[in-house]
């Protein structure tokens, strides 16, 4: 496999802990149980217009899988899985085949990764919680507007509220990618990745771990 080839795997965020590095300094890490995944389909430039592998992850009761999905997994010769995603690549013909397992051993020489997950949903939140506004005065003439937004624009000019003005609204539950996180350790025996810092999502949430796009993946 090419050293610069994008590598990716699905996993579950287990939570955060702290470990010690070679200089005996405390390092906060997020533990991700990654894989094992299985390759269920290969996309090629000739047939699909782009190169990618489709990987599946997670156990699921076969009775909860519809017929098209069951047929897709059966064609690949694998048992049904809960999650399916595609990882774009430059060339997959020589590196992967349908039915092949994808494990954390793939990241043995990787130093930095990008992690994608779904952030915690907070529901409908006010401007102070959602955007960190300071709020208004607690007394001295303030009438029930302590946590309100305040001014949202002028009257005659422009005579409207600009699009994108920060207000109250639905907070969280967004797809977020955190880039260039240091991959602290790969535990192949337990299928664990120890990633320095925090990654998006709640404990038990699905995450996608890929080699860092903005360089430094193998530095």
Swiss-Prot record:
InterPro entries: Ribosomal_uL3, Ribosomal_uL3_bac/org-type, Ribosomal_uL3_CS, Transl_B-barrel_sf. The keyword rRNA-binding applies. Coiled coil: none annotated. Keywords: Ribonucleoprotein, Ribosomal protein, RNA-binding, rRNA-binding. GO terms for biological process: translation. Gene3D superfamilies: 3.30.160.810, Translation factors. GO terms for molecular function: rRNA binding; structural constituent of ribosome. HAMAP family: Ribosomal_uL3_B. Part of the 50S ribosomal subunit. Forms a cluster with proteins L14 and L19. Belongs to the universal ribosomal protein uL3 family. This is Large ribosomal subunit protein uL3. It comes from Corynebacterium kroppenstedtii (strain DSM 44385 / JCM 11950 / CIP 105744 / CCUG 35717). The gene is rplC.
């Amino acid at each position: 496999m090419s050293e610069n080839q994008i590598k990716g795997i699905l996993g579950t965020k287990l939570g955060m802990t702290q470990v010690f590095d070679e200089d005996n300094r405390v390092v906060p890490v997020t533990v991700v149980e990654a894989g094992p995944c299985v390759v269920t389909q290969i996309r090629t430039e000739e047939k699909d217009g782009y190169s990618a592998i489709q990987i599946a992850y997670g156990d699921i009761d076969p009775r909860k899988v519809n017929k098209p999905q069951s047929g897709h997994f059966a064609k690949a010769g694998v048992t049904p899985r809960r999650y399916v995603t595609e990882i774009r690549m430059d060339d997959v013909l020589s590196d992967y085949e349908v039915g092949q397992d994808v494990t954390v051993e793939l990241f043995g020489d990787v130093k930095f990764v990008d992690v994608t997950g779904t952030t915690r949903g907070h529901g409908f939140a006010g401007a102070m919680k959602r955007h960190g506004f300071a709020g208004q005065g607690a007394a001295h003439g303030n009438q029930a507007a302590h946590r309100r937004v305040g001014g949202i624009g002028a009257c005659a000019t422009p005579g409207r509220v600009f699009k994108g003005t920060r207000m109250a609204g639905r907070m969280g539950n967004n797809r977020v990618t955190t880039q260039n996180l240091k991959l602290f350790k790969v535990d192949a025996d337990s299928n664990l990745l120890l990633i320095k810092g925090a990654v998006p999502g709640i404990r038990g949430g699905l995450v996608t771990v890929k080699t860092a796009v903005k360089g430094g993946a193998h530095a």
